[in-house]
Amino acid sequence: NLSTDLWSTMGEQRQTNYALRAPDKATFVELVTEGQPPAPGYFVYNAILNRQDRDLLDETEMPPAMTYGEVRQVVDSGAILVDGRSPEEFALGHLRGAINIGLEGRYAEFAGSVVMPDVDIVLVTEPGLELEGKNRLARIGFDRVVGYLSEPYQVMFSHRDDVRIASRLT
């Protein structure tokens, strides 16, 4: 139960906050975590990063645009291809090996659950959403976006042998 107050004092919180009346740390933790979903998979990694001195995220810095050949080279070397387009667009056609994590949903949380944090990432997005994809991943500590596929629809049209189609069940 979160208060709408913009500020408070420790004295007031000790009187009114149920969790601060817990007799010990274990009871406090139990009270404040009751009914909460489990922490996302990336949470421990992110907590460790939060304790380190790190450069500030430049939210205006675009990831590098990459050609199809450059993308294939880094993916073949172990990078993950994260396709942030809608599930419908992904199903109609995506590059071999791509993982669909749509930007319109819980993008960072889902990516943090399926992508390892120590792996390079290449993005495929709708044109103009590359920076959003990079920034949302960086906010959970996944700052190894090495670039994005430039002109994804033209690339898929030109390299049909590397395009896969997926069925969607509803």
Locate the predicted segments by residue.
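Accessory terminal helices/loops
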Residues: 1-147
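Amphipathic alpha-helical protein-interaction segments
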Residues: 150-151
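Active-site neighborhoods of enzymes that stabilize oxyanions during catalysis
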Residues: 154-170
